[in-house]
Amino acid sequence: LWWLPESGLLAAMLALLAAACLLLPRGAPGRLLGLLLWLPLLWPQRELPSGPGALDMQVFDVGQGQAVLLRTAGHALLYDAGPRSRSGFDAGERIVLPALHALGVRQLDMLMLSHGDADHAGGMAALVASLPIGQVRGPAGMGQPLHGHCQADDHWQWDGVVFTVLHPPRHFPYLGNDASCVLRVDTAHGSVLLAGDISALVEQRLLRAGSEALAARVVLAAHHGSSSSSSGAFVQATGA
């Protein structure tokens, strides 16, 4: 199959006009020129971030789980892969992968799994089987095969956007939710904080390490908004 990015309204209207042209009687002048009006469907606008420091963030609706796409001008990172349930429903295959196709994402530079629970890492296998992925990273000790681990103070820069891992520190034991990779993304227009499923205990540790690193314009609530996370002090420190 040849996957095409989702087209805009203008391209769809031009395609309908092209179909109307082709339905004209044979011999009608310019009838076959209607084929040219289908070209915008083949090369749709991808609406990528433009310029240094720009970021596009898409939070996919995967139900009880998480999958977040972060795109700079030339790179793409997926934070978590969506859930896979015991019934066999795989959000990585049914939701995340079609959404990536619709957005024109043909490969991922990185898949970062916050931790190994099925609602965050369950869709990994479907994505790895279907997309070229530069590297898969997650906390040390999780069961899934990884190319490398996320550790505090890891940082890199793509197209003027800076990515920094705040948690877990080196040699931190794998504790499931509380071992989640906490990722901070600094752009030219503000910061994003992705906290996985950490609890208030880890939030307190991050506060002791320095609340200035938590200040962000956008925060995705930890552990799906659980009452065991998003403590008052943490929320106040983010100022989101």
What are these model-derived regions, one by one?
Residues L1-Q58, R71:
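Transmembrane helix-bundle segments that form internal channels/tunnels in multi-pass membrane proteins
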Residues P49-A54, D159-R170:
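Short Pro/Gly-enriched beta-strand edge/turn motifs at strand-loop
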Residues G51-P98, A102, Q107, G176-A200:
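Conserved beta-strand hairpin/beta-sheet module of binuclear metal-dependent hydrolase folds
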Residues F60, G92-V96, S114, A118-L127, ...:
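Active-site-proximal loop/helix segments of hydrolase catalytic cores
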Residues L70, Q151-G160, L183-V185:
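Short acidic-hydrophobic surface loop/beta-edge motif
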Residues A76-D80, D109-L113, Q135-G138, L193-A195, ...:
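Structural recognition of the beta-strand scaffold that forms the well-ordered cores
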Residues V105, I133, A237-A240:
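Proline-aspartate-enriched helix->loop->beta-strand connector
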Residues G116-D153:
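Active-site HxH/HxHxD metal-binding segment of metal-dependent hydrolases
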